[in-house]
């Protein structure tokens, strides 16, 4: 048996704050918190819809609260940030070839955003 002590490097809790890449990563991952609240708000909305018109009106007034509206706006911005980072990463992860040539990265990203805009427009027209 060896009496040698293994080297253990000290790791501070704020190690990520010294590097811009990791700061952005932590910001992007922290956007899940408002999304969780948004999902809970919608779940309670479904529950109030089942309970009846009075509960539904109470939920609608809750959703009109400025704090809840702010949380929903932050959740929307977080979702857009996730979409932007995913769309910009997609051409690097899965390069698309047409007739043996690589499709330009900007075209792939713009096509994804166009699909998001088109689907959003369809949903707005249906609802």
Swiss-Prot record:
- Signal peptide as annotated in the record: none
List the GO molecular function terms: succinate dehydrogenase activity
Q: Sorted alphabetically, which InterPro entries does this protein's record hold?
A: Fumarate_red_C, SQR/QFR_C/D
Q: Which compartments is it annotated to reside in?
A: Cell inner membrane
What UniProt keywords apply to this chain's record, in alphabetical order?
Answer: Cell inner membrane, Cell membrane, Membrane, Transmembrane, Transmembrane helix
Membrane topology according to the record: Multi-pass membrane protein
Instruction: Give the residue spans that cross the bilayer.
Output: 30-50, 58-78, 107-127
Q: GO cellular component annotations, sorted alphabetically?
A: fumarate reductase complex; plasma membrane
The UniProt subunit note reads as follows: Part of an enzyme complex containing four subunits: a flavoprotein (FrdA), an iron-sulfur protein (FrdB), and two hydrophobic anchor proteins (FrdC and FrdD).
What is the documented function of this protein? Anchors the catalytic components of the fumarate reductase complex to the cell membrane, binds quinones.
Q: Which family does it belong to?
A: Belongs to the FrdC family.
Q: Which protein are we looking at?
A: Fumarate reductase subunit C
């Amino acid at each position: 048996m060896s009496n040698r002590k293994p080297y253990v490097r000290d790791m501070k809790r704020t190690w990520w704050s010294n590097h811009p890449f990791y700061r952005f990563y932590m910001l992007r991952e922290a956007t899940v918190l408002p999304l969780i609240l948004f999902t809970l708000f919608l779940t309670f909305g479904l529950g109030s819809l089942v309970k009846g018109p009075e509960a539904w009106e109470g939920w609608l007034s809750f959703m009109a609260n400025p704090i809840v509206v702010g949380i929903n706006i932050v959740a929307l911005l977080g979702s857009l940030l996730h979409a932007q980072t995913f769309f910009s990463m997609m051409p690097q992860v899965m390069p698309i070839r047409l007739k043996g040539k690589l499709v330009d990265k900007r075209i792939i990203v713009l096509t994804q955003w166009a699909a998001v805009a088109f689907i959003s427009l369809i949903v707005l027209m249906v609802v």
